[in-house]
Amino acid sequence: MTMKRYAMTKPCLAGLLASAIFAASAGPLDDAIEKGTRFLLARQQDEGCWSDRQMPALTALGVWALCQSGLPREQTHDAIARGVRFVLATQREDGGFYVPKPGRGGSGLGNYNTSVCLSALFVSGQAPATALLKAREYIASSQLTGDDTMAGGFGYDKISRRRYADLSNTAYALDAMRRTSSLEELRPGGARVDLDWDKALAFVENLMKQDGPDAGGAAYNARTPQAGRETNATGRVSLRAYGSMTYAAVLSMCHARLDRGDPRVRQALEYCQKYWSLDENPGMGSQGLYYFYDILARALAAAQVAAVGEHDWRRELAAKLCSLQRPDGSWMNDNNRFWESDPVLCTSFALLALELCREPAPGGETPDETRM
């Protein structure tokens, strides 16, 4: 798969026009969020879930998006409460949030579901601490140990037929554990549950390209060629980096307590600048596009980056998402890879990204934010 190259020093004319049009209107971002939120409210099922009942993470993403919508509490409270109750009902004795699936060793994408559910439940403020602490135990016990390239990472399931970890699941796990770390103060007896953050960081670094045109970019995992393979000048074959995984690496490194001045973070952000695009998930085209928008926003917000090169990412991303919203308030990807033909999933991703596009302070830039 070929990757499009983009100019680094100047924003494209389309991006400038979109940002100018977006900035000139008083509330297109808030209007888009309200329309998307009302779509989610209308699509919630009677038992409180969204989409596939076997995948509590899909409901959790809807809850998370509603919690951060900014709409008056009385308009979203009941839907959030019903979603929270549904997710809590999927918690197993081992602390994970998932629906067992015998064909997958019984785990039912336990790591993925539990990480997303833990973050959403914490944001909701409506889940008992005991349930969240059990989920933290589940995630911590799912981190792979050892000394190989998988060590420190997370796969889809705690139990699987083969040893496996990838950057997407790892980023969700690290985000959930860092986001909820304050809960450990509530754990009785002075005990604490946490990850091996050094191992997690090593796992992320191992997936980052050190040289060549993709330097600073990150691959999905050490085995699966999601975006293809490439051979460097020494003849070494490796997996090609792409956009969403590079932002996942940035987010993960921030959670591992690296700041944007760290050379590893800077190199990843330079890759993001080099291949800046909101028309595609760089290196993957339309595959996983709405996941890409969400992880981009979360990573750049966590790194406290106000602009990527000349690109004001908040304004450009908000303008792009507003332009993609469908008349019924939803978003949907025509490419079904990673379940993105589901408008509930894409709408949740889009809302979470838009909610991070709100300016952090008057003037659009806090003292801690910088332009890359």
Which residue stretches match the model-derived regions?
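Secreted/extracellular ectodomain signature
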Residues: 35-37, 84
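Active-site-surrounding "flap" and adjacent substrate/cofactor-binding loops of secreted or lumenal enzymes
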Residues: 84-90
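An alpha-helical repeat/solenoid feature that recognizes helix-turn-helix modules
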Residues: 26-35, 49-79, 93-137, 142-319, ...
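N-terminal secretory signal peptides that target proteins for export/translocation
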Residues: 1-8
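Bacterial N-terminal signal peptides
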Residues: 11-20
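Short, solvent-exposed mixed-charge patches
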Residues: 370-372
